[in-house]
Swiss-Prot record:
Protein name per Swiss-Prot or TrEMBL: 8-amino-7-oxononanoate synthase
E.C. number: 2.3.1.47
Lineage per the UniProt record: Bacteria, Bacillati, Actinomycetota, Actinomycetes, Mycobacteriales
Family per record: Belongs to the class-II pyridoxal-phosphate-dependent aminotransferase family. BioF subfamily.
GO biological process, one term: biotin biosynthetic process
Length: 380
C-alpha cells in the first residue's frame, strides 16, 4: 500500500477519538479575573500571587531591567536581582548556594542530568513528578524505579549496583496525593551506600518545616553536603521559575554542565522580583505556612477524607475519569474551581478531585467551599 497522499498527521484523529472515549480529552479554559471564582485548584499555597508587595516587586524589576532576560544567564540574562534572590533563598532554606533556572521543570532536568550521566545509577520513586521522570530518561544513566516510598527497595538498588556513582531522586511532597517522602530514612540509605540525594521541594517549600523552610529543614537535612534541593517559584512563592540549591561545588558544576541553564533564556526579571518579594513576605509572616495546613484539614473534613493532610493538597478519589470530571464541572458551575486529575497523571481507577488550600482563604470562602463540595460530592 502506497503512503503517497496520506497526511502525516492523520493518526492524530484516531488518538483523539480514543482519548474522548476514555474520558481523557483535555482542553484549555481561560482563568477568570481574581474574585469571580473561588480558587481551590491553583498551587498559590500562601496566597502571594496577588499580594500587593509581590506585584510591586515584579513591577519594580520590570521597570529596572526590562520585560525579558534578553539572553541566557551566561550571556545577558543574569542581573544583580537574580544573584540577590539566590543568596536570600539559600540563606532561608539553609543551603550553601542557589542557582535560578527558567522553571522548576528545567531546574530538575538540569540538576538530575548534570549530576548523573552514563556509567551512573539513578534510583527514582514511582510517583516522582514528570520533570524528574523526564530527567531520568534524558540522563543516559541506568534507571531503577522503586515502589512508592519503599526505602528498602531503594537500599537494595544502591547496595547491588555496579556503578560507582548513584543518585536517588524523590519529591518531598508528592503532587497528586500530598503525602510525604521518608526523607530521613532515604538519606540514611544514601549515606550507607555513598549516594547523592536530589529532593524536589516544589510542594514543601512554604508549607512544611520551621517558618515554611521545607521538609528537608523539618527532618534536619537542610544544608546536608550530600543533598541537593530543587524547587519551583510558582507555588508557595506565587511567581514562576525554578531553583537548584546545595553545595557551592554543585552550583559551579551546573553553570558549566546543566544544558537547560546554559542554553535557555534566563528567568525574566519580573518573575525574580516577584519571587524575592514573596520570600520577604514569608519571612515576615511565617503564620501563612500553618494556615495552609489548617485550611487543608478543614477541606479534608468537608470532603470526607479520613487522613489529616500533610500538605496543602487534599485528594478526593472518585474512581473513573468521567465521574471526577463531572464533579469538577459541577463545582465550577457553582463558582468553585477544583483540580481534576485523570490518567496518565494518576493510575487508572484513581481519578480524583485535587483540592489545594491557600493561606488567604477567608471564612466566607471556606463556607462556600463547604456548601458546594458537600452537595457535589453527595451526587458523585
Amino acid at each position: 500500500m502506497t503512503r503517497a497522499g496520506l497526511s502525516p498527521l492523520a493518526w492524530l484523529d484516531e488518538v483523539e477519538t480514543q482519548r474522548r472515549a476514555a474520558g481523557l480529552r483535555r482542553s484549555l479554559r481561560a482563568r477568570p479575573p481574581v474574585g469571580t471564582v473561588l480558587d481551590l485548584a491553583s498551587n498559590d499555597y500562601l496566597g502571594l500571587s496577588q499580594h500587593p508587595r509581590v506585584i510591586d516587586g515584579g513591577v519594580a524589576a520590570l521597570r529596572t531591567w526590562g520585560a525579558g532576560a534578553t539572553g541566557s544567564r551566561l550571556v545577558t540574562g543574569n542581573t544583580e536581582l537574580h544573584e540577590q534572590f539566590e543568596d536570600a533563598l539559600a540563606s532561608f532554606v539553609g543551603a550553601d548556594s542557589a542557582l535560578v533556572f527558567s522553571s522548576g521543570y528545567t531546574a530538575n532536568l538540569g540538576a538530575v542530568v548534570a549530576l548523573s550521566g552514563p556509567g551512573s545509577l539513578l534510583v527514582s520513586d514511582a510517583y516522582t513528578h514528570a520533570s524528574l521522570v523526564d530527567a531520568c530518561r534524558l540522563s543516559r544513566a541506568r534507571v531503577v524505579v522503586t515502589p512508592h516510598n519503599d526505602v528498602a527497595a531503594v537500599a537494595r538498588a544502591l547496595a547491588t549496583r555496579d556503578e560507582e556513582r548513584a543518585v536517588v531522586v524523590t519529591d518531598s511532597v508528592f503532587s497528586a496525593d500530598g503525602d510525604l517522602a521518608p526523607l530521613r530514612e532515604l538519606h540514611d540509605a544514601c549515606r550507607r551506600h555513598g549516594a547523592l540525594m536530589i529532593v524536589d521541594e516544589a510542594h514543601g517549600l512554604g508549607v512544611r518545616g520551621d517558618r515554611g523552610r521545607g521538609l528537608l529543614d523539618e527532618v534536619g537535612l537542610a544544608g546536608a553536603p550530600d543533598v541537593v534541593m530543587t524547587t519551583t517559584l510558582s507555588k508557595a512563592l506565587g511567581s514562576q521559575g525554578g531553583v537548584v540549591l546545595g553545595p557551592a561545588a554543585v552550583r559551579d558544576h551546573l553553570i558549566d554542565a546543566a544544558r537547560p541553564f546554559i542554553f535557555d533564556t534566563g528567568l525574566a526579571p519580573a518573575a525574580v522580583g516577584a519571587a524575592h518579594a514573596a520570600l520577604q513576605v514569608l519571612v515576615e509572616e511565617p503564620w501563612r505556612a500553618q494556615r495552609v495546613l489548617d485550611h487543608a484539614t478543614t477541606l479534608a473534613q468537608i470532603c470526607g477524607v479520613a487522613d489529616v493532610p500533610s500538605s496543602a493538597v487534599v485528594s478526593v478519589i472518585l474512581g473513573e475519569p468521567e465521574v471526577a470530571l463531572a464533579a469538577a464541572m459541577g463545582c465550577l458551575e457553582r463558582g468553585v474551581r477544583v483540580g481534576c486529575f485523570r490518567p496518565p497523571t494518576v493510575p487508572a481507577g484513581t481519578s480524583r478531585l485535587r483540592l489545594t488550600a491557600r493561606a488567604s482563604l477567608s471564612d466566607d470562602e471556606m463556607a462556600l467551599a463547604r456548601e458546594v463540595l458537600t452537595d457535589v460530592l453527595s451526587r458523585a
